[in-house]
């Protein structure tokens, strides 16, 4: 014996559209100090931010002259990872180079 419902459900579920927004972006910024060699800064920019030597040198000079230089703009997780990698590498090499992230 089959159970048959008294009423058929004729309602239609409406699909709610989710508005997706792009992820927040963050600038990764190197800060100047009086002790980290310029060549080390160039190497860091080339290695961790995949910049060519000329671009890396320009970023290093901006850090040297203006006190800070943007190495790139990334999503939060990537920016955070790059900051950690740069600071860790600098400490292991005995340099006080600072790297921070700021909302773009």
Swiss-Prot record:
<comment type="similarity">
    <text>Belongs to the ClpS family.</text>
</comment>
<dbReference type="InterPro" id="IPR022935">
    <property type="entry name" value="ClpS"/>
</dbReference>
<dbReference type="GO" id="GO:0006508">
    <property type="term" value="P:proteolysis"/>
</dbReference>
<protein>
    <recommendedName>
        <fullName>ATP-dependent Clp protease adapter protein ClpS</fullName>
    </recommendedName>
</protein>
<dbReference type="Pfam" id="PF02617">
    <property type="entry name" value="ClpS"/>
</dbReference>
<dbReference type="InterPro" id="IPR003769">
    <property type="entry name" value="ClpS_core"/>
</dbReference>
<dbReference type="GO" id="GO:0030163">
    <property type="term" value="P:protein catabolic process"/>
</dbReference>
<dbReference type="InterPro" id="IPR014719">
    <property type="entry name" value="Ribosomal_bL12_C/ClpS-like"/>
</dbReference>
<comment type="function">
    <text>Involved in the modulation of the specificity of the ClpAP-mediated ATP-dependent protein degradation.</text>
</comment>
<comment type="subunit">
    <text>Binds to the N-terminal domain of the chaperone ClpA.</text>
</comment>
